[in-house]
Swiss-Prot record:
Belongs to the ATPase alpha/beta chains family. This is ATP synthase subunit alpha. The lineage of its organism: Bacteria, Pseudomonadati, Pseudomonadota, Gammaproteobacteria, Enterobacterales. It is found in: Cell inner membrane. Its EC number is 7.1.2.2. The keyword Signal does not apply. Keywords: ATP synthesis, ATP-binding, Cell inner membrane, Cell membrane, CF(1), Hydrogen ion transport, Ion transport, Membrane, Nucleotide-binding, Translocase, Transport.
Amino acid sequence: MQLNSTEISELIKQRIAQFNVVSEAHNEGTIVSVSDGIIRVHGLADVMQGEMISLPGNRYAIALNLERDSVGAVVMGPYADLAEGMKVKCTGRILEVPVGRGLLGRVVNTLGAPIDGKGALDHDGFSAVEAIAPGVIERQSVDEPVQTGYKSVDAMIPIGRGQRELIIGDRQTGKTALAIDAIINQRDSGIKCVYVAIGQKASTISNVVRKLEEHGALENTIVVVATASESAALQYLAPYAGCAMGEYFRDRGEDALIIYDDLSKQAVAYRQISLLLRRPPGREAYPGDVFYLHSRLLERASRVNADYVEAFTKGEVKGKTGSLTALPIIETQAGDVSAFVPTNVISITDGQIFLESNLFNAGIRPAVNPGISVSRVGGAAQTKIMKKLSGGIRTALAQYRELAAFSQFASDLDDATRKQLSHGQKVTELLKQKQYAPMSVAQQSLVLFAAERGYLEDVDLSKVGSFEAALLAYADREHGELLQQIDQTGAYNDEIEGKFKGILDTFKATQSW
């Protein structure tokens, strides 16, 4: 075989022309220590605060401490097989989670991966877990209500769209029950819901998901889960991931509701991470920035104006405001609301619903203490009918508590005092409500009207519950159109007042309970 030099040179030229060199510059570092989910890395000179660091085995860590000679990072997931000397790389990316309508009805972990066995997620893109809250100019005042379906909350501690209302109380006082019922009540309101479970047992979360499914509310809800068995890093980041998913709807001119259950466990997870990173401890061993931990999260819940929505959607959505309403939950120890984390969150939020174990154990459920529960901005969002009828309830309860304390020492009470005590007891009984039984605005209004106008005076205390159930069944059967009209408009006028009087007079004259 004879080789032609011309052919060889042509072949070499062709190969040289086709030769393509792709060079990638990686900022690479070396793990120098691994302990309790924290790694220290040497050599990552260009790493950003909060950047994802690529680890062997398709895992990531997040850079939290940038020091002179090393980087302290928290591992997202299992870390038992990581060892000193392993190579890691910068990614140049901040942690992002999938967002979109495809997440509704799904259960996901902190990183947005589905854990409900229903297949891959259908998402609309990714969003950074850490985002700057809307500015002052981009916001709009709260003037539309979020109905929880609880008489005691909607009447005395109303919540508006875009508000942050803290639910605070000891363990086993009905905090999660109140939040779950608020989600169930949004089935037909158009409000999308996000439930973030932090540091809870997997069995508890499974029960919550099942209840949401049973009541037809799961298809409207995203459940974000960081169980007690997961790393502190995932528990710390879960609320931010859930918030990013909720902001997707807010920024597109829709309304969303997010529940953080609960932020006490998130603060404990953050304290654990901070101590392992050797940050100096402060009060109750929490780091100095634990206030900022919660403020930067809760400030993202807001009502944004139409200009913000139009600018965000590049003109696709016009004339619509968006909102993200937050119901953070805080667990107290022995009713101590003056502890570090509870006082922080109380000062950040727009009011609090305080649930008391004494009331809960006495059978008053929801165990709301109306004396120290408050809504700072929700009053402006109340429907006209609720605002008109709820004023007397708070006053009646305040007078009842004062007289009840006084009557323990006074043996002889006059008729007016006895009447007030009896009225207060009946109002307290009337505000009791079973779990998973939220009430519409019209139903609540009719019941409050009956209490305020003295229709309970001749009803025995033990019969108040059956009186209410019979009244609502009668009104629904005979005056369904009126109730629907009130639910749609929330209006209150002389005509509606007259109709309510007619309903109650006829009911008391013709029905038994």
